[in-house]
Amino acid sequence: MYLKSLKVENWQCIEYTKPIFENLMLFIGPTNNGKSSIISAIMFFLGYRNLRTKDIRNLDLPLELEGTFQNFSQANYKNLKDFIYKKELTLKIQKFPNYDVQYKIKINRDWKIITEETYREILSHIPILYIPPFQDKKQINFLVNSLFEILKRRNISEDLMVNSLKELANTLQNDYVSKGLYRNLLFEIFRSISEESQKRNHSIIGNTIVFFEEPELYLHPQAEKELYNAFIQLSNLGAQLYISTHSSNFISLKHYKSICIMRKYKEFGSKAFQFKGKLFSGDEVKYFNMNYWINPDRSELFFAKKVILVEGQTDKIVLGYLAKKLGIYKYNYSILECGSKSIIPQFIKLLNAFKIPYIAIYDKDNHYWRTDIEIENSNDKNHSIQRAINFKFGDFIEFENDIEEELYNEKRERKNYKNKPFYALKTVSEEDYIIPARLKEKIEKIYK
């Protein structure tokens, strides 16, 4: 039994949103933009937490949560078949002003009021583990007991593997565990669960939903990447993992359907942004994945307030350096090296899909020493970049003919393009270097 969608209305900082769920969900976005709100809404809907007055965004309006479940095991289907319609089970919680909470289930096309007890009985088919950023002793004990109860229900409680988990859990429950050790023990526990699940070719915690807030805390980058891989493997084998994170090590462009960006607006509060369509086709998939493996740091684009797309290393180094020199550099803007001009449209597709503000910087490449065929080919690539841009949140700047000519304010010979990043940085870092007016204007536009 898997949660597939949840409509959220009038909850905390959310006026209305409806995320669609993958087995692995990655909730990202700036602090105070709604990540905790969407997670708390899911937890309340699943019966894991109580309703508090402050959870209702506007007390004069109804609160409503409506979720749909799919993919039932044989045992689940047998117990819930009376409630399943067209392979889906749909539940609703409503709270009208001055009235008690109502629980409803959709039977065929009609809504039927049910008791809270019946509601919770239905949801008991989805075990839950919750890991907040920090836990006290009582919460740690509850987490450990919940984990072993899940394993017991799945007849894994007497397994040899469970003994090693118990050793880790005993250390976790120690009175003198530091926050750093606590987080590292959680890392070891989930790595063990993932490894054992892979051996058995199914999740040993079944369809459990794991809520894990900020799993990156107190972990070094290599451990973050390994834990993220453990999450991927577990989700592929049947577990449901809902992660909120500020670390690009828990984001992969390959799993873009798992990404849910929370954004906050003055007019209508926080909203979830996802893209469930197909971004690339044919050779685009191969080239994009190859490009990603060359530089996996590109995942940071999902955390940026604005993304600056550039062709190569020279542009990335020089633009950042000159922006600092001009006093306009912004740390919440990410300069993304795409690798080549032909790859830029693919990144634009990705940014368009998630409505992330961006500006694409590319070389016109119409140098006087180029052949007509080279210039025609270059212009085709330039036009493909321009056509890909959604000007609601994207733009472009064209260098004439490349950043080197902009830096030196002169036409460049073909022979002058060896060791470009080194010589470009050497030039702009000289004390008497004056940024040409045309280049300064372009950098100011990039960082506006």
Task: Please tell me what each predicted stretch does.
Residues 39-86:
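Conserved P-loop NTP-binding catalytic core
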Residues 257-366:
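RecA-like P-loop NTPase motor core
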Residues 17, 127, 208-209, 306, ...:
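The start of beta-strands in P-loop NTPase/AAA+ ATPase cores
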Residues 104-106, 123-212, 373:
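Extended helical coiled-coil dimerization/tether regions that scaffold
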Residues 60-65, 87-89, 122-128, 239, ...:
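Short glycine-/polar-rich loops that comprise or flank the Walker A/P-loop
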Residues 1-47, 174-297, 317:
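Switch/communication elements of ASCE P-loop NTPase nucleotide-binding domains
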Residues 364, 369-434:
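Activity-critical C-terminal alpha-helical subdomain
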Residues 56-69, 115-138:
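ABC ATPase nucleotide-binding domain signature region
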